[in-house]
From Swiss-Prot:
Highest taxon listed in the record's lineage: Bacteria
Pfam short name (any one): UPF0758_N
Family classification: Belongs to the UPF0758 family.
Record-annotated MPN domain positions: 102-224
Motif (JAMM motif): 173-186
MF terms (GO), sorted A to Z: metal ion binding; metallopeptidase activity
Family matches, as CDD domains: MPN_DUF2466
Protein name according to UniProt: UPF0758 protein CV_3079
Amino acid sequence: MSIASWPESERPREKLLSQGAATLNDSELLAIFLRTGIKGVNAVELARRLLQEFGSLSALLAAPLPAFKAKPGLGEAKYAQLMACTELARRALSEQMRLGDALSSPQQVRDYLRLSIGRREVETFVVIFLSAQNRLIEVEEVFKGTLTETRVYPREVLRRALRHNAAALIIAHNHPSGVSEPSSADRVLTDTLKRALELVDIRLLDHFVVTGGHAESFAERGWL
């Protein structure tokens, strides 16, 4: 059955406009993005099938172009649209972080990091440089590694922190495996960086281990 024949209150676009985006499930939101279905399958049903085939919404968003465009109803144009939407959301979060206290909204920082590095296929180490008021100065991707590890040099992190005249840092790296549990090596690195930064009176506020669907906080675990 085509969506046009549904009661108006059940159509995804009309439902969003009248009740707000938060009231829609993943399939309905994805259907709005898809706009149309394929022969014999409306957009909502196509969205359901895609979510089932990819396994989750985060997996769909993290899919590389070859896997994405191999699915019926998807292609390079949809992939470009999706990447553009993701980048717009990341930039909007970056603007908000520059205007406010980064610690006042930990979820905002989490969302930014998930959008920035959560879907990367290799480990990427990011440093968020903050002022004395915890305002964003800059975000830099400092190191990149392999599928399972990245080498991080505390001296380079310290050098960049001093160059930015940062008073505090938040560090983060992704786990391409999709498992956000910190490793023992992650904890050792965090302790090493914290001690190095303390020598020049710079605070290490948090370390996030990031995947497409989650960002695990060292501070919330009491490890900082």
